[in-house]
Amino acid sequence: MSWWWKRSIGAGKNLPNQNKENGVCKSYKSVALVVGVTGIVGSSLAEVLKLPDTPGGPWKVYGVARRPCPVWLAKKPVEYIQCDVSDNQETISKLSPLKDITHIFYVSWIGSEDCQTNATMFKNILNSVIPNASNLQHVCLQTGIKHYFGIFEEGSKVVPHDSPFTEDLPRLNVPNFYHDLEDILYEETGKNNLTWSVHRPALVFGFSPCSMMNIVSTLCVYATICKHENKALVYPGSKNSWNCYADAVDADLVAEHEIWAAVDPKAKNQVLNCNNGDVFKWKHIWKKLAEEFGIEMVGYVEGKEQVSLAELMKDKDQVWDEIVKKNNLVPTKLKEIAAFWFADIAFCSENLISSMNKSKELGFLGFRNSMKSFVSCIDKMRDYRFIP
């Protein structure tokens, strides 16, 4: 089955209407519940699960998110359910009737990184689905490589593991809601005879204007504002981050990785890293970003005072409103479509490389070219009219 995982970038971009023939709906082999479907990986799952050659398919897909269904997601073949999963009664009311679910893909979190709230959200999902979906087989939990260096709120108080990160490294002795989610997963799947998988993606390159940590969207907005104001694209990060190697993962590849673990017996009950299988440097990404927007690039300058991207963009709300109106873009607010604080963290980080050896040894051979993935995400932002 490993041939399927070698697909090209953007494979889910143009979905055929593969689930209908002569107006009659096909039967489904598997039914997915994607929690966090408007997020960066959730939206990719919504596309990749519906491809005609996706293993385990044909798939029916329920998509859950807190906000109303956005226009760009409404065009996807997903049964959308607006639900605040932090509310137990609302979650039970809306999800317990879904008795045909076979696989849960949990790719959601709350931005405060609060352990109790994130744990409650996950528990509410499992408590609503497991007792009612008699055909449930697998629960996929997505966390991330913060498992190896701590959550953002702990900052410099944490001594991270040495990279490259491998899945067998012990938990750091600091609060991390990933630990709470894993413990809940192990307990609930164990007592209900379900299989599970935990996925730890690297920095994700993908499309979703609703994501709290979308580096590509953030950089696209920054570059768009620079072009609008006829300013150079200045790198706001550290010297080390400018020069060191980094890794990332295409959101579609994360989706493929999670589907693989959900259907391939070799990958069941495993903790798995996920990245593109190559490395890049921000200095090269920065050059490509400037080229894509047709603006001058200014990289790291030795001795120059470093100004954070959040500081550079703090008064640009009205500028962004002008850009949206001038170019007839999908209406968005700056705080919705860009996370400058997150870019600042990425541009001050170094040596956060994870190993894909375990997944390869188990049979997952998927990969992406990180530079091409980055450009593809820019193209998608333009296709959906979020940037000019």
Curated annotation (Swiss-Prot):
**Which residues are catalytic?**
146, 178
Question: Where on this chain does NADP(+) bind?
Answer: 38-40, 66-67, 84-85, 108-109, 142, 178, 204, 211-213
- The EC number of this protein is 1.3.1.122
Q: Which UniProt keywords apply?
A: Cytoplasm, NAD, NADP, Oxidoreductase
- Known consequence of changing residue 146 to A? Reduces enzymatic activity 6-fold
Q: Name one GO molecular function term.
A: oxidoreductase activity, acting on the CH-CH group of donors, NAD or NADP as acceptor
According to its UniProt record, where is this protein mainly located? cytoplasm
Question: What tissues has this protein been observed in?
Answer: Expressed in internal phloem-associated parenchyma (IPAP) cells.
Q: What is the effect of changing residue 178 to A/F?
A: Abolishes enzymatic activity
Q: Does the keyword Oxidoreductase apply?
A: yes
Q: Where in the cell is it found?
A: Cytoplasm, Cytosol
Q: Which GO terms describe its biological process?
A: monoterpenoid biosynthetic process
Broadest EC class assigned to this enzyme? oxidoreductase
Instruction: Give the result of residue 349 to F, as annotated.
Output: No effect on enzymatic activity
Sites where the protein binds substrate:
146, 178, 349
SUPFAM superfamilies given for it? NAD(P)-binding Rossmann-fold domains
- A single cellular component GO annotation: cytosol
Q: Its catalytic activity?
A: (S)-8-oxocitronellyl enol + NADP(+) = (6E)-8-oxogeranial + NADPH + H(+); (S)-8-oxocitronellyl enol + NAD(+) = (6E)-8-oxogeranial + NADH + H(+)
Assembly information from the UniProt record: Homodimer.
Q: What does this protein do?
A: Iridoid synthase that catalyzes the first step in generation of the iridoid ring scaffold using the linear monoterpene (6E)-8-oxogeranial as substrate. Iridoids comprise a large family of distinctive bicyclic monoterpenes that possess a wide range of pharmacological activities, including anticancer, anti-inflammatory, antifungal and antibacterial activities.
**Assigned protein family:** Belongs to the short-chain dehydrogenases/reductases (SDR) family. Highly divergent.
- Full protein name: (S)-8-oxocitronellyl enol synthase
Q: What is the lineage of its organism?
A: Eukaryota, Viridiplantae, Streptophyta, Embryophyta, Tracheophyta
